[in-house]
């Protein structure tokens, strides 16, 4: 019998098939030359939105269980993530979790305000749902919005990929968020898990991380990365296996 995939493994293949995770020669906004790139703007179909919500829900459920009252999606990329995650939490785990998001500009007519969706209450346990984090900027912008709405307990930040890179100092953005705001960040996968899983593995007949690419990625992390090498998938509850997450080598979109 074939071994079931973890949702982490599924998510890595999902990113590759969706054209979100690519390999080659790229330059980051900070000017770093990187051998891989993650472009979450390439998610664009209903199927992808549905699957993405399931991966976020799996990560959230594994790390926080049912200890969340509301999901907050920072405008703009966080909005569909929070909505799709809340749907998946209900469909997969029976958790009917509230969701809300902010407007970039306050509305001065109708109901007004900067918040849309669930009205946060004092004591609510909130998880922020975001695509990636490369600096603490997004969190710094979120905190006044959330704390201005109610006296909430921000339990976690859930993101798709932890690049495990240093920022301007010696810490990663995730480490800085924990240190400055006391907020735990949970990635669906880390870049080291991506390397471990994809190295020498064919996805639809193509090997994306061969020995040369692995060496380039490890050299990049040696220069800009944080934390130890390694990162095998499947350690602890965050890598649990289960039929709920099986893709069975499904393509990007289901056939009709």
Task: Spell out what each predicted region is.
Residues 1-129, 134-256:
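PRPP-associated nucleotide enzymes
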